[in-house]
Amino acid sequence: SFSGGKPGEVNSKEWQYTNHKNIRNFIRKWGSMVKHDDLMMPIVVPKYNIGFVVKNCNEQLLEILEPWCSTIYIDHSFDAKDYIDREQPNTLIDLSDRIQSIHAEKNNDIEVRFDGSKLTNDSFQVIQQLPEILSNDEGIEDDTVGSFELDIFEIMIYNTKTYEEELIKCER
C-alpha cells in the first residue's frame, strides 16, 4: 500500500520504521532534511564535506549526530561497533568509514569541533541548519578559509566546495 503498511494504516510500525530509515538516509546523502518552497518544489541545500570532531561522545549522541556529517570523529569512551552493527543494515553507506577515532587524520573540507556533553536542543538546531548557515554567510566565498565559533562549535573551513551535483544520479 501507499502508506508502507496495511491499507489504511499510515502510521503502522512498518511505515514508521521505513519512514525513519529513509529520513536518516536522506540526511546522510544530502546533509539536511527535505526542504520545499511554497509551491512544494524541492529546495536543494548545499552539501558540504563536513566532519564532526566530538569529545565526550556516547552511543546516543552518535546515533543523533552521525547522519548530519560526512565523517564523525569520536573519542572511544564506548564501542562504536555496536552502533555500526545495529545501523549498517539500514543504509548502503559504509558506516565504518564514516565513524572514526578522534585521533584519526581529518580530511574533511569543514571541521566542526565540539564537546558532546554540551550539546543542547539549540545547538542541535545549529547542526541541522549548518549548510544553510554556511551558504548564507556573505563572508564565505569560494576561496574562503579560516575558523570561527558559533554556539558550542569551533568551525574550521579548509574548502567551501559543495557536492550536491555529484549526488544526482541520472542513468539512461
Language model feature labels by segment:
Residues 2-105, 146-172:
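C-terminal, non-catalytic tails of nucleotide-sugar-dependent glycosyltransferases
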Residues 93-133, 153:
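Short, well-ordered secondary-structure micro-motifs within conserved domains or adaptor modules
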Residues 134-144:
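ANL superfamily adenylate-forming
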